């Protein structure tokens, strides 16, 4: 509800992130969807060992202030290697499905994908590709769809799909599609899809 005045403290307890990556991942991270059916005779067009008709579409959703997907650790450095296959372009993070961080209640920030910012360094091989969607929403609070925190090194962000943030309605709130914090490192951002922030 938009009015939380009648809710008890235990009703407003915050959950954690849906996905936390606090260790090294040599083969990269992919949030995938079934491939397009270009050849009806081929039941496994992406050659991943699973019949395409039996594959689902990745959806990661968090209600509350925690990031839907958090990559990094407070006590150690984290290295994300490249995802296999030419379609990944050598990138360590590929998002073909959807990620959403929804603050839900009034004054609770929303965070989609957060890399770094916890204390340890995070390196992502090649960068990241968004073919699907990464989004964040809030009710009168900050919202960031993608945030690179201090210590994050992501060579590039390639957006073919959508990175969107909605929320904040006051002069002090920040709504950002992509936020790059001090201490984060990125060489380029390319966009042939949509990157938006709406207050």
Feature annotation, model-predicted:
Residues 1-199:
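Surface-exposed loop/turn motifs in large extracellular/passenger domains
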């Amino acid at each position: 509800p938009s009015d939380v005045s009648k809710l008890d403290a235990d009703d407003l307890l915050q959950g954690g992130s849906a996905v936390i990556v606090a260790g090294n991942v040599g083969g990269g991270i992919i949030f995938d969807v079934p491939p397009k059916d270009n050849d009806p005779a081929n039941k496994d067009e992406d050659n991943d060992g699973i019949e395409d008709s039996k594959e689902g579409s990745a959806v990661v959703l968090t209600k509350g202030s925690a990031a839907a997907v958090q990559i990094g650790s407070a006590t150690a450095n984290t290295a994300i290697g490249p995802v296999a296959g030419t379609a990944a372009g050598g990138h360590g993070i590929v998002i073909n499905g959807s990620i959403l961080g929804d603050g839900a209640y009034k004054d609770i920030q929303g965070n989609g994908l957060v890399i770094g910012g916890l204390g340890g360094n995070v390196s992502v091989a090649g960068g990241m590709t968004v073919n699907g969607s990464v989004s964040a929403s809030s009710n009168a609070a900050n919202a960031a769809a993608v945030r690179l925190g201090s210590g994050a090194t992501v060579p590039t962000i390639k957006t073919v799909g959508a990175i969107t943030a909605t929320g904040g309605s006051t002069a002090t709130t920040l709504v950002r599609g992509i936020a790059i914090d001090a201490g984060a490192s990125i060489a380029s951002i390319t966009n042939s899809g949509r990157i938006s922030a709406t207050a």
